Amino acid sequence: MLVRFSVENFLSFKNLTEFSMVAGKMTRHSGHIAVCNHKRLLKGAFIFGANASGKTNLIRAISFARNIVLNGIERTNCDKKFFRIDEDCKDNPGVFQFDIFSQGHFYSYGFAISYAAAVEEEWLYQIDNPNKEFCVFLRSKQENDETFTISSDIQFKDGRQEARFSVYKDDISSSKMKQTLFLRDIAMRSPEDSPEYQPFR
């Protein structure tokens, strides 16, 4: 279930723009509210606005980011998707973030990509506790390098799982994987979809 979507430097969105399904304080239409782990979320929403105000581009942004998660950057057209009114934006990454509710937990997943079709950064946090985020993984590109560093708060109890995760980390840290999202790579290797990946299907 989508809780929030954020986008920056994509088509008509230069600055960070957010679409939220978190319910406001009004309680007039309580039947339109779903309560998930004590958080009130809208069951549905409409997008209103004047012509050429960005409604279609918001849908395009969600579709573009979802396509990258499901099919990979190499199968996604990234040409001229940056905010073209400002030429400086050509060299800035496009940023996409999904906050989702899946299998009883809240997650925040996002990535930043260059429009040369390469991952700059990628992150996945479990955000059940508003005061403390749990880092499932944070993938950051090294300065002046094409390789990545991976950090995580996961404490493995099973040595086999830790070894498996270590192999994933080593593989995705390579410069050869700069067009591959870590979340997609894990999902493709796993027999079952992870709860963080399922909402994108």
State each model region's role.
Residues 13-15, 103-107, 131:
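Short acidic/polar mixed-charge low-complexity motifs
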Residues 1-64:
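Pre-Walker A-like glycine/lysine-rich segment at the N-terminus of P-loop NTPase domains
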Residues 108-201:
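Electropositive, glycine-dotted interaction segments
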